[in-house]
């Protein structure tokens, strides 16, 4: 039992990605960098570090609640039934977080798929609170939300690219790369509107 528990600790990086805010935050930061046009600044490691720090901020209340429950319901490694019962109580805050930030349409779609793909006895018992449904539904919802945010982020930067391209064309300066002028303008716009702060604030508020 102890070996099983220690082995489960190796799943922590996986759970960090699929059960927390990390996926959407990291996606949004990477899409923002690509939208601006600076492919390697900040570097991937820096963006993942920012995403991890932001995830810790978002997940702090959930982690605090889990910590409190661990103190109230110590994990009994010597008894499988007690361990399962304790784990169910301990992970409830995380499951509540995922459910709160999951698109109901995604849950309904997955429930429909269980009727087609799972054995009848499993499908009949499936409900939206099962971790087997909650985790993939949360991941799909985060992916969808991340791409929606990315689309909105791209719009102003595409407008700048179009304006610069048309301006150069009108001036007969086709030999000048539009990126040469649009990149500084996009960086200036992002700095003037406090882009990083506003972006992270929007991500934080999306989990309220």
Curated annotation (Swiss-Prot):
Q: Which Pfam families match?
A: FliP
Supply the alphabetized keyword list: Cell membrane, Hypersensitive response elicitation, Membrane, Transmembrane, Transmembrane helix
- Per the record, what is one GO cellular component? plasma membrane
Which positions, given as ranges, span the membrane? 2-22, 46-66, 149-169, 176-196
Q: Name one GO biological process term.
A: protein secretion
Membrane topology classification: Multi-pass membrane protein
Entry function:
Required for the secretion of harpin.
List the protein's name.
Harpin secretion protein HrpW
Q: What is the lineage of its organism?
A: Bacteria, Pseudomonadati, Pseudomonadota, Gammaproteobacteria, Pseudomonadales
